[in-house]
Design a protein with these regions (language model features):
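Glycine- and acidic-residue-biased ligand/ion/polar-headgroup-sensing regions
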Residues: 1-21
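Short acidic-glycine-tyrosine-enriched beta hairpin
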Residues: 5, 19-55, 94-97
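A short hydrophobic beta-strand segment most commonly corresponding to one strand
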Residues: 5-7, 63-78
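Residue-level signal for secondary-structure boundary sites
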Residues: 14, 46, 76-79
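Short active-site-adjacent structural elements
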Residues: 56, 77-82
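Asparagine-centered strand-capping/turn motif at beta-strand->loop junctions
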Residues: 57-61
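Long hydrophobic alpha-helical segments typical of transmembrane helices together
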Residues: 84-117
């Protein structure tokens, strides 16, 4: 959703960057290709770009706890993040808790109006 700087204090912080291959027009669908995979060493950093230019995953492939520091810029005005399921070529929107509650309440009201009418 925004730019970010990712760093690690300990070994074991893996970063995988992806490129989106589809045009984003088909709702719920996203075809991603892995572009690079690397593991940061203590004190190393990397960055991510906003939106589709910065699709990435991070994790710890090892068995020892990794300590990381990730700093992200101000979110764009889109209002949601996108969560990608790489194996299934799927994408769905993730909303902040407050916004999601408002959306759920509006959906419930619409449902009640439809049931009463």
């Amino acid at each position: 959703n925004s730019w970010g700087v990712l760093g690690t204090v300990t070994d074991g912080f893996e970063v995988i960057n992806y490129r989106r291959e589809d045009d984003g027009e088909r709702e719920g669908y996203a075809l991603l290709t892995e572009m690079e995979r690397f593991t940061l060493r203590p004190g190393e950093t990397t960055f991510t770009r906003p939106l589709d230019a910065g699709i990435h995953t991070t994790g710890n492939p090892g068995k020892v706890t990794a300590i990381t520091l990730n700093l992200y810029g101000k979110s764009n005005q889109r209002g949601y993040l996108q969560n990608f399921d790489i194996k299934e070529d799927r994408v769905h929107r993730v909303y902040p808790p407050r916004q999601k509650k408002i959306m759920l309440a509006a959906n419930a009201m619409d449902h009640l109006k439809g049931a009463a009418g």
